[in-house]
């Protein structure tokens, strides 16, 4: 079966049942939520949701956020609080991620964060809307 889950494996950990299979540490997200951007030298670069989420950990004061990829060159970031300083720092973190991974930095648009009141069971912070 193919479930499209992105998994984090437990390093050097044996299964408690005694089987010699690989142990999962956690489910990191869905393959559908992996962003794909054009690489600087051609080709594509896959960017996993946790890589994008980490960009927000380094920005002081961010209480809530959601990132949507709408195309190869456009991200929409919903963030609270939406201040000039937060926008500059988030943009710098995302540009740094692009530089480290070697993809063309997308245009980043900012919107105020509004809590999602739809029927979703699990809140998504990183979502690929361009599929």
Which residues fall in each region the model found?
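Active-site glycine/GP-rich loop and adjacent strand/helix microenvironment
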Residues: 1-131
